[in-house]
Amino acid sequence: MEISWGRALWRNFLGQSPDWYKLALLIFLIINPLIFLVNPFIAGWLLVAEFIFTLAMALKCYPLLPGGLLAIEAVMIGMTSPSHVRAEVAANLEVLLLLMFMVAGIYFMKQLLLFIFTRLLLSIRSKALLSLSFCLAAAFLSAFLDALTVVAVVISVAVGFYGIYHRVASSRGEDNDILDDSHIDQHFKVILEQFRGFLRSLMMHAGVGTALGGVMTMVGEPQNLIIAKAAGWSFGDFFLRMSPITVPVLVCGLLTCLLVERMGWFGYGEKLPEKVRQVLQQYDDQSRLQRTRQDKVRLIVQALIGIWLVIALALHLAEVGLIGLSVIIMATSLTGVTDEHAIGKAFTESLPFTALLTVFFSIVAVIIDQSLFSPIIHFVLQASEHAQLTLFYLFNGLLSSISDNVFVGTIYINEAKAAMENGTISLNQFELLAAAINTGTNLPSVATPNGQAAFLFLLTSALAPLIRLSYGRMVWMALPYTIVLTCVGLLCVEFTLAPMTEWMTQQGWLATLS
């Protein structure tokens, strides 16, 4: 029997999202204009809370849809104006270019990255050293590349290896369905479960590695670029100003990696079963024999482009997004990718998030127009200069662990810069606050998948159900890192940030905002 028009419309609205979620969004859309008529300030805060809710519920529906509907309504009822949204987007064009072109550029270097992680996995037999290597490699790559892309590559490696062993274990050849374990003997199931535990721990180490490396440079995370632009810092300035916090955090993060692996805490410590290693090694040996000279040239070209990328970023030869565009042009030209559709695939990962970031800027425009954060900022700025750093770090960390860190970082750096321009805080204090805001948004946010885009990407990937990586298990496995990164970051903000920054300024290493 044909369903009614109303039922058809309800089913189409937000697609497969739960009915309670659809109903909640409709209630938001109905009450927002009514409350705005009574009290714009409360309506503004309600909008922010609703938007954070859509981010927290990202597994129910991609936040672009519900968040976009809320943003459109906010503009329509006068919470902000289209011209202000346009101004916010224009002010953050570099970030949008980063997401559009840099992520797409790295897509064409995936073969090299796959090669690197495959070599690591099969060359290092010690699980503790392998975990440390994955964490370090992810950290280094994320300092120069987009964290989403790094995680996507590690996911590709893990899915590939899981599929290889699953095919052997099920004895079904090319017809094998990696989601179906019904054809696997009990002995192989035990080994497969161990392999899942091994892959879960590696994925979490790599994910945390992207956070450890991403916080260190202005291109590591999208919000870093927003903060660097507000403070007028170059690539080198940003790295040096973050180093009093990020270097100790990196060291402690790597020690945590070794500790949880050695002790087998929080679901870590599972080793690669020897039978799985033999299967994977045979497959890799066969792949290497089949690699042509043309394939080897592609790897060499991608490595050279990687060197160009690091040099161009370090010397700030152009805007980050334009450097990414140069990577796209060189990588496609020199590796033979000439088809428009093949090139278009590179943009599928980044454009949804780019659109979501534009919606963020709409909400930021509402926050500015309605002065929503003024009471909080006023409260923080009443404290002593030293206490301000701690409060900014903690407020950022708390919000970033439940919301998106790009959103949180953008709000707080805008408020801090406004306070500096109004003469409420000094230039020197603003630069210290910028460092506290950056580390506050990046480090505590590893607590949940909501805070780190790379974690959310992992949780929603095809790999997660294969290795039994649920939301709760991810939070549990991230817990030791959350505690260590947050506490060490806080101690560094308290005790090393100001004196080390002052010392580097005296040495003439740091530029200041003019």
UniProtKB/Swiss-Prot annotation:
Keywords: Antiport, Cell inner membrane, Cell membrane, Ion transport, Membrane, Sodium, Sodium transport, Transmembrane, Transmembrane helix, Transport. The chain crosses the membrane at residues 23-43, 52-72, 97-117, 120-140, 144-164, 202-222, 238-258, 303-323, 353-373, 391-411, 447-467, 475-495. It comes from the Bacteria. Coiled coil: none annotated. It holds the Pfam family NhaB. One of its GO terms (cellular component) is plasma membrane. It catalyses: 2 Na(+)(in) + 3 H(+)(out) = 2 Na(+)(out) + 3 H(+)(in). GO terms for molecular function: sodium:proton antiporter activity. It is a multi-pass membrane protein. It is found in: Cell inner membrane. PANTHER family: NA(+)_H(+) ANTIPORTER NHAB, TRANSPORTER ARSB-RELATED. Belongs to the NhaB Na(+)/H(+) (TC 2.A.34) antiporter family. Na(+)/H(+) antiporter that extrudes sodium in exchange for external protons. This is Na(+)/H(+) antiporter NhaB. The lineage of its organism: Bacteria, Pseudomonadati, Pseudomonadota, Gammaproteobacteria, Enterobacterales.
